[in-house]
Amino acid sequence: MSVERTLHHFPLDPASRQVRLALGEKRLPFVEMQVRYWEMPPEFTSLNPSGMPPVLVETKHQRNLVICETRAILEHIEETETEPPLLGRDPAERAEARRLLQWFDRKFDNEVNGFLLHEKMEKRLLRMGAPDLAALRQGREALRMHLGYIESLLQTRDWLAGRRMSLADFAAAAHLSVIDYFGDVPWKDFQAAKTWYMKLKSRPCFRPILADRWPGLAPAAHYDDLDF
């Protein structure tokens, strides 16, 4: 019997986007339930007490399996749906992919999203006032450092973790895609990173990401352009 999947997510959440990309790449159908997580709806917090997306609910034989938090969901998908593998085919690549997942979900999130997305998105959603220019500047400086790191990896690799595309690429692209939604990625100064991102952006699993829109938050003009 097939598994029915429902993903509770917020379209402009990098963590949610990672899961959507993984499900799409493995061609696993799922129903989307968009959640305004900042309002702490009880039907959502009953699934995940932390109140944060994404949450994946799998239904099989009329029984629900609720999986919370990005890494747990990604590891579950990889364990239960093994093709195509998204953590590498050898231990070294799997270890490197996991290291980079942690890099983007912790270091990039703290140093870049914690400033740019907080100022440009969270403040708007929570009606916290105008963006702080000093915080935006700090986030943009950190973003350039991370883009430089991506380029250093790509000097000797086809993809971030090695020879094959992996969840590390999806993690990086998920974070960058939300920053790019607001037009803050200086692609012209990082051509190797831009070429890598264009390859990901052209994959079928990325199409729903490029179609994302949120009322009152319009994307940059080039956001859904495959040849930007």
Curated annotation (Swiss-Prot):
Keywords: Cell cycle, Cell division, Cytoplasm. CDD domains: GST_C_family (cd00299), GST_N_family (cd00570). It comes from the Bacteria. It is found in: Cytoplasm. Its main location: cytoplasm. Residues 90-223 form the GST C-terminal domain. InterPro entries: Glutathione-S-Trfase_C-like (IPR010987), Glutathione-S-Trfase_C_sf (IPR036282), Glutathione_S-Trfase (IPR040079), Glutathione_S-Trfase_N (IPR004045), GST_C (IPR004046), Thioredoxin-like_sf (IPR036249). GO terms for biological process: cell division. Belongs to the GST superfamily. This is FtsZ-localized protein A. It comes from Caulobacter vibrioides (strain NA1000 / CB15N).
